[in-house]
Design a protein with these regions (language model features):
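Small-residue-enriched alpha-helical segments and adjacent helix-cap loops
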Residues: 4-8, 30-172
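Acidic/polar, glycine-rich intrinsically disordered N-terminal extensions of enzymes
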Residues: 1-27, 139
Length: 173
């Protein structure tokens, strides 16, 4: 509303919008909304909430991203605020899913179930997310920054991230 009344600078709004996980689209008056699902994990209720968001505010399609998130296209600008509140009601956020921030922390898609994993890395990914989200240092980076956790030697994603961590257990000797 404040943007439409000229009370907010367009560049300030763009920076704020990106930090909130919202991209403008080429089409007028619609946005792309991206969630931030730490390590790609969610509950059944959260998945149902995402499905409801797609039906209510988007075009009914949940796009799965390479960072283990979902994004929704064609969300009307006037629906974004209510949609974000609906997500928050289920413990979901879009905060820092876009822009020059620490992007979603990913983990091996088999974390917690892989027979070859050294240990489940998902709790470590979630801890890093919880520490970094809304942290002053991560709000205005020169570029997006990506972190990934792998639980076994077969996890191939760690080497292609800014920080890639693979599980290891070392003896103290």
């Amino acid at each position: 509303e404040r943007l439409n009344r000229g009370k907010v600078d367009v560049e300030d709004f763009k920076r704020f919008r990106l930090q909130q996980g919202i991209y403008g689209q080429r089409q007028d008056d619609v946005q792309m909304v991206r969630t931030k699902l730490s390590t790609g994990r969610m509950t059944t209720d959260q998945l149902l909430c995402l499905s409801d968001f797609a039906d209510r505010y988007s075009n009914g399609i949940l796009h799965v991203t390479t960072r283990q998130d979902f994004q929704f296209h064609f969300v009307k600008l006037e629906d974004v605020s209510k949609g974000l509140q609906d997500l928050a009601d289920y413990g979901l956020t879009t905060r820092e899913a876009c822009g020059n921030t620490v992007r979603n922390v990913t983990a091996c898609h088999k974390a917690g179930t892989c027979k070859e994993e050294i240990f489940d890395v998902a709790p470590y990914g979630k801890a890093v997310t919880n520490y970094l989200i809304r942290h002053a240092v991560t709000q205005n980076l020169p570029r997006k920054f990506k972190i990934s956790f792998g639980g076994c030697s077969g996890c191939g994603l760690a080497p292609i991230h800014d920080i890639g961590l693979n599980a290891q257990i070392r003896n103290k000797d």
